[in-house]
């Protein structure tokens, strides 16, 4: 089944500063949606609005036309990978996979070193290895939509390439929205692109527009 996620009618301010205003962004099954924007332009805030982490009545978030009125999200609808590590440090690696109901053997087929770390606690892993676990769990979850905030941070180029291939496979079953400062990776993997600028969103129909905005040379 194809699904459609939309957000618009956003008004987000912190004090007297407007963060987001004229916004419309959509994600759908079968597509990866990349979002560009300078530091402080509201990319993370936008993902948090979609995920319900920033409470404001001045927004409309819809899945298949049905408004999501509560601030909490059904994990079957949406999962989010934040910029910071989010898994509890005291749990074992295998326990995280059991909680998300994700195949650990499949994970190890991509990242073989984890076969020796099955019962290691998360706090014993490096930040990069934790990121690998968390990103895989979100992408392989049963959610209709995955929101990824800086998914390539702390990853080696090899692991970035692995996750780009995983995203290409997973998008057949879900919609994926991602932001990242590694702009070339975002343009290479995305089907749709948006730029956040001056509190508004702009859909990029021509890749050369990204040169005008200063994201590509």
Question: Residue locations for each model-derived region?
Answer:
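Conserved structural motif at the start of ABC-family nucleotide-binding domains
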Residues: 5, 19-22
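Helix-to-loop junction immediately C-terminal to a conserved catalytic motif
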Residues: 51
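ABC ATPase NBD coupling module
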Residues: 54-55, 66-79
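Q-loop/switch helix immediately C-terminal to the Walker
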Residues: 80-105
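Walker B catalytic motif
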Residues: 150-151
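Conserved beta-strand-loop-alpha-helix hinge in the C-terminal portion
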Residues: 200-217
């Amino acid at each position: 089944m194809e699904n459609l996620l939309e957000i618009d009618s956003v008004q987000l301010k912190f004090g007297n500063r407007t963060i987001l205003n004229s916004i419309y962004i959509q994600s759908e099954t079968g597509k990866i949606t990349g979002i560009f924007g300078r530091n402080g332009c509201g990319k993370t805030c936008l993902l948090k609005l979609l995920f319900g982490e920033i409470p404001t009545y001045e927004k409309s978030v819809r899945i298949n036309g049905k408004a999501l009125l509560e601030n909490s999200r059904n994990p079957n609808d949406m999962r989010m990978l934040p910029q910071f590590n989010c898994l509890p440090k005291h749990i074992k690696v295998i326990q995280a996979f059991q909680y998300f109901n994700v195949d650990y053997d499949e994970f190890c087929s991509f990242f073989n070193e984890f076969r020796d770390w099955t019962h290691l606690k998360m706090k014993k892993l490096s930040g990069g290895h934790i990121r690998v676990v968390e990103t895989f769990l979100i992408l392989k979850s049963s959610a209709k939509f995955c929101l990824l905030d800086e998914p390539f941070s702390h990853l080696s180029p090899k692991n970035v390439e692995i996750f780009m291939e995983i995203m290409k496979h997973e998008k057949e079953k879900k919609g994926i929205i991602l932001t990242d400062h590694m702009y070339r990776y975002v343009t290479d993997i995305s089907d749709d692109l948006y730029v956040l600028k001056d509190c508004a969103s702009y859909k990029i129909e021509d890749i050369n527009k990204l040169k005008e905005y200063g994201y590509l040379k």
